[in-house]
């Protein structure tokens, strides 16, 4: 799990700079290291619900995988917030958006808000006009089937997956 914490810290430190100035060597190196540590974390604990949904919308509509993940991430974090509260609270402290001693629920909320803000800073939209509502049921079924094998704090169900898809659909 330490690799994941390092990756998150590096992303929050370097992503905006790398996005705004592709020539910023330090930011690009920071993001390369974030990708490395993120990959190491995935190798240790696998992926989860975000990927299960992202694989479906990416495959169906040609949305690049990173963009699909970024589009979906805050919604799945919110869906799993209660079950993952202590880990989300820890990540809030890692990125410096909270103070030790704050309630875990508040810290978890601050971390999810920081993810949303970071996403906005790098031009990732809240919704996609490519995703069609008439496809939601099939996308949800496929995401649920894929997600069953992932070690997640909260399994997807049809209602929650349909709600997440609705939140990202124009």
Predicted regions and their residues:
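Glycine-rich phosphate/pyrophosphate-binding beta-alpha loops
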Residues: 36-69, 146-151
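Residue-level detector of well-ordered alpha-helical segments, enriched
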Residues: 3, 7, 27-30, 49, ...
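Carboxylate- and glycine-rich phosphate/diphosphate-binding segment that chelates Mg2+/Mn2+
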Residues: 1-45, 153, 159
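Buried hydrophobic positions in well-ordered alpha/beta secondary-structure cores of metabolic enzymes
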Residues: 31, 51, 65, 73, ...
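Mobile late-domain/C-terminal helix-loop "cap" segments
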Residues: 74-170
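A short beta-alpha structural unit
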Residues: 8, 32-37, 41, 56-60, ...
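NAD(P)-dependent dehydrogenase/reductase Rossmann-like domain
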Residues: 22-24, 34, 45-46, 60-66, ...
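A generic structural signal for well-ordered alpha-helical segments enriched in polar/charged residues
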Residues: 13, 17, 59, 117-120, ...
């Amino acid at each position: 799990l330490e690799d994941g914490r390092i990756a998150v810290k590096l992303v929050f430190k370097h992503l905006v700079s790398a996005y705004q100035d592709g020539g910023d060597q330090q930011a690009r190196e920071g993001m390369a290291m974030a990708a490395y540590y993120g990959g190491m974390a995935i190798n240790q604990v696998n992926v989860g619900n975000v990927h299960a949904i992202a694989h479906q919308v990416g495959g169906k509509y040609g949305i690049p995988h990173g963009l699909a993940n970024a589009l979906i991430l805050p919604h799945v974090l919110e869906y799993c917030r209660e079950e993952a509260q202590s880990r989300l609270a820890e990540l809030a402290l890692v990125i410096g958006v909270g103070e030790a001693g704050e309630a875990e629920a508040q810290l978890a909320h601050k971390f999810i808000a920081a993810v949303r803000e970071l996403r906005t800073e790098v031009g990732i939209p809240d919704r996609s006009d490519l995703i069609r509502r008439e496809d939601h049921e099939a996308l949800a079924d496929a995401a649920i089937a894929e997600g069953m094998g992932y070690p997640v704090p909260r399994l997807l169900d049809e209602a929650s997956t349909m709600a997440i898809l609705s939140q990202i659909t124009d």
